[in-house]
Curated annotation (Swiss-Prot):
It comes from Emericella nidulans (strain FGSC A4 / ATCC 38163 / CBS 112.46 / NRRL 194 / M139). Pfam families: Glyco_hydro_43 (PF04616). The keyword Secreted applies. It catalyses: Endohydrolysis of (1->5)-alpha-arabinofuranosidic linkages in (1->5)-arabinans. Keywords: Carbohydrate metabolism, Glycosidase, Hydrolase, Polysaccharide degradation, Secreted, Signal, Xylan degradation. Gene3D superfamilies: Glycosyl hydrolase domain, family 43. GO terms for molecular function: arabinan endo-1,5-alpha-L-arabinosidase activity. Endo-1,5-alpha-L-arabinanase involved in degradation of pectin. Its preferred substrate is linear 1,5-alpha-L-arabinan. The record marks D149 as: Important for catalytic activity, responsible for pKa modulation of the active site Glu and correct orientation of both the proton donor and substrate. InterPro entries: GH43_arabinanases, Glyco_hydro_43, Glyco_hydro_43_endo_a_Ara-ase, Glyco_hydro_beta-prop_sf. It is an enzyme of class 3 (hydrolase). Its EC number is 3.2.1.99. GO terms for biological process: arabinan catabolic process; xylan catabolic process. This is Probable arabinan endo-1,5-alpha-L-arabinosidase A. The lineage of its organism: Eukaryota, Fungi, Dikarya, Ascomycota, Pezizomycotina.
Amino acid sequence: MYLPTLAASASLLVGVAHGYASPGACSGACNIHDPALIRRESDGKYFRFSTGNKISYASASSIEGPWTAIGSVLPGGSSIDLDGNDDLWAPDVQLVNGVYYVLYSVSTFGSQNSAIGLATSDTMDLNTWTDHGSTGIRSDSSKPYNAIDGNLFQDDSGTWYMNFGSFWNDIYQAQMKSPPTAVASSSYQIAYQPAGEHAVEGAYLYKYGNYYYLFFSEGKCCGYDSSRPATGEEYKIKVCRSTTATGNFVDANGVSCTSGGGTIVLESHDNVYGPGGQGVFTDPTLGPVLYYHYVDTTIGYADSQKLFGWNVLDFSSGWPVV
């Protein structure tokens, strides 16, 4: 999620691939920030959630669209008693035992007074969401992390985890109760960029084959229309992997993700600038799909002009390639 007052650290590693495919097609409501994507089991309809408008969301018959705006998940804001509870950020959506879970972040720019909340619905239809308030993952200035950008993940044993964090000491993980409405354990660090402003956030964990892939965004995410960073310091998507969901993530060069490791999956190219805020979705036709927001430099650099992007991922090398 965005902390536009903070400068980004420079990218330290080259990606597996240097030539990137253009984003997949998008029609309809395509302006977005911090997308989260899921497909409804009952009818195959796609739902896409995003920062803004108290978690705005849209639906479509395919990932390409046409996307139609639905409204807000929590039109009355969050019950969490923190500043920012009427301006919710960085959703994540998962299906848990037939119920759709949407995580959201409550915070204000540059603040560690943050919490990750939960809303649920059986159908994802408008006005069917129940706010459960805080998951128990919160932060203030006494914590080494910032409790935003939550991502739920279930490992092969059925255990649920929450990945979260932005800047400060970057990405943390905590085991969740089952069902995962509340935290069950203390948290531990799984990714850290020691250089610069520790500009890592937006973790998303995805299992493919024998590996758990930890995707994250690194760099300056926002405010490009008024203050663009030095070349290479804008948002980009990186990844580390592990044979366990709970740590020991390394990049393609063997560098630990807690020591600044991270292999580039997608960065600025052609008219695509600052891709990030990503997730990975298993499409029934396309297979693994990386989705994200980005600036189209032929349109404009404002946050309100950011677009929904997606690309099929190729894991044949053991690493995700766009």
